From Swiss-Prot:
Keywords: FAD, Flavoprotein, NADP, Oxidoreductase. This is Ferredoxin--NADP reductase. It comes from Nitrobacter winogradskyi (strain ATCC 25391 / DSM 10237 / CIP 104748 / NCIMB 11846 / Nb-255). The keyword Ion transport does not apply. InterPro entries: FAD/NAD-bd_sf, FAD/NAD-binding_dom, Fd--NADP_Rdtase_type_2, Ferredoxin-NADP_redctase_2. Homodimer. Its cofactor is FAD. Transmembrane segments: none annotated. Belongs to the ferredoxin--NADP reductase type 2 family. The keyword Flavoprotein applies. Its EC number is 1.18.1.2. HAMAP family: FENR2.
Amino acid sequence: MSEAIKTDVLIIGAGPCGLFAVFELGLLDMKVHLVDILDKIGGQCAELYPEKPIYDIPGIPLVTGQGLTEALLEQIKPFNPTFHLNEMVESIEKIGDPGFRVTTDAGQVFECKVVVVSAGGGSFQPKRPPVPGIEAYENISVFYAVRKMEQFRDKEILIVGGGDSALDWTLNLHPLAKRITLLHRRDEFRAAPHSVEQMRKLVADGTMDLKIGQVTALEGADGKLTGAQVKGSDNTTSTVSCDTMLPFFGLTMKLGPVANWGLHLENNLIPVETASFETNVPGIFAIGDINTYPGKLKLILSGFHEGALMAQKAHRYVYPDKRLVFQYTTSSSSLQKKLGVN
């Protein structure tokens, strides 16, 4: 077992909410380490939609998931957080008042005063369509997420699904692709009406195809797709020519070890009080999509707000004898000094 790393705060999850929490904690002189099961920083933003536009970040009309991640990393540079990627927290043990010993599946041990769970909905994996032999094509010509749009330039793409992800990527990839076919099991969609309207206009213009049915088999060799057999609503089978398939059937969310950390759970979410977003265990907080409370909105901006209030309470655990004086970055010379702006 590795020697324990001592830190003020350990954040579990390096998505946008976890990253902004570093900023709020750093302003209050708390040192932070972050652990994430993914191999990259940014959580779902980086893993699932790095190039997908986000429109509801205050003051930023449009930013991609990757762009938001990069901006947050730039913002927290002055606080020099340490990241531990490809590691999953397995256990949290109380060792003081306050104080916790946290152990990962890599054998790394942390000793900290505060734990912040910012793990989104837990670990996630795409739902795989029930198509025989699809595994042989995965990551070669079948993909469950778009990480680089340029990868799909001049491709003949079959997009499968009827939700927002399927419609969004149909519209976003349309200018790049050689041809796009959208396939859904029925001619009704669970996506934003504006997106559905745009898609139907492209179909009417003849620049893309819409088919109703389900994929029953794939055609190709050595992982390289040449087509997909589709069974229509009239039970007839046809072949859709494609060299790339993007199935968007949603995600399977798994809490994993979170369920064993002694935290109360409601429908796989962690209940918190809304003054500081603390859990039933003093010193353990939950922010972002992993938590629940009356009126909760699963928005990145909500997680930012939660992180700011969490940091105020965390300060009491890390510095129990130090009075916290609230300050503004616009007027506080000490905060500006921490940020390196004066």
